[in-house]
């Protein structure tokens, strides 16, 4: 086993380098997804029925169709529909962010609904604008309540980002596939990729627990 590791050390490094690509997609997508999710969640709790219908329709579309289909439409069909050819990176980030936003919106909506309505009514009685009530009072509390769920969404994105290899992006999965073809050995490269994904997830979970404890103390 040791001789095998030494022999394939350069290829192991080649696979591990894909971790940065996977992280890049996941972090950017989850940040954009959080922004989209917040906007959708605000629409869902809004009294305007048009905004609620739009937000619910958006969520149903992106939760009701596979991420792979969404990625394929954005990358392959966009040039024919809107005459724009997205790069692999842009197509990946857009599809991941739009998909993540749908799930995050439901999480944030649930978090907003857990906040005592009396706080909103008290703020309105003080003539505080609704935008500031949501931004400074409701959302900060909701985010604290749903932090573990947001971390789970980041973890899901890290694992689901493997489908970007379908478009030839040199992420963890794609690099493992290349090494598998070159060495005629599928088990070892895929094992290395699986270990990288696992370490990433465990590391994020560990950091999230530390942050969560500090949030509880504060």
UniProtKB/Swiss-Prot annotation:
Role played: Part of the binding-protein-dependent transport system for glutamine; probably responsible for the translocation of the substrate across the membrane.
Pfam families, sorted: BPD_transp_1
GO molecular function ontology, one term from the record: transmembrane transporter activity
Listed name of the protein: Putative glutamine transport system permease protein GlnP
UniProt keyword Nucleus present: no
Top-rank taxon: Bacteria
Domain ABC transmembrane type-1: 19-208
UniProt-listed CDD domains: TM_PBP2
UniProt-listed InterPro entries: AA_ABC_transptr_permease_3TM, ArtM/GltK/GlnP/TcyL/YhdX-like, MetI-like, MetI-like_sf
Gene, per the UniProt record: glnP
Protein keywords: Amino-acid transport, Cell inner membrane, Cell membrane, Membrane, Transmembrane, Transmembrane helix, Transport
Transmembrane segments: 25-45, 57-79, 86-108, 187-207
GO cellular component, one term: ATP-binding cassette (ABC) transporter complex
Membrane topology per record: Multi-pass membrane protein
Subcellular location: Cell inner membrane
């Amino acid at each position: 086993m040791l001789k095998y590791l030494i022999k394939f050390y350069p290829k192991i490094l080649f696979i591990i380098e894909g971790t940065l690509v996977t992280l890049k997609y996941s972090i950017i997508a989850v940040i954009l997804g959080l922004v989209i999710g917040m906007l959708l969640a605000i629409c869902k709790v809004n009294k305007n029925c048009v905004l609620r219908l739009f937000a619910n329709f958006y969520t149903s579309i992106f939760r009701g169709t596979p991420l792979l289909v969404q990625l394929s439409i954005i990358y392959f069909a966009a040039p024919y529909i809107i005459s724009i050819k997205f790069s692999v990176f842009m197509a990946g980030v857009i599809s991941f962010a739009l998909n993540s936003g749908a799930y995050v919106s439901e999480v944030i909506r649930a978090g907003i609904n857990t906040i005592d309505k009396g706080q909103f009514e008290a703020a309105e009685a003080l003539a505080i604008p609704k935008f500031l009530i949501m931004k400074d009072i409701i959302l900060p509390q909701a985010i604290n309540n749903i932090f573990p769920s947001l971390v789970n969404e980041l973890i899901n994105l890290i694992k689901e980002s493997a489908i970007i290899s379908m478009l030839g992006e040199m992420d963890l999965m794609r690099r493992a596939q290349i090494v598998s073809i070159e060495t005629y050995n599928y088990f070892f490269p895929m094992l290395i990729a699986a270990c990288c994904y696992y370490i990433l997830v465990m590391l994020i979970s560990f950091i999230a627990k530390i942050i969560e404890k500090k949030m509880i103390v504060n």
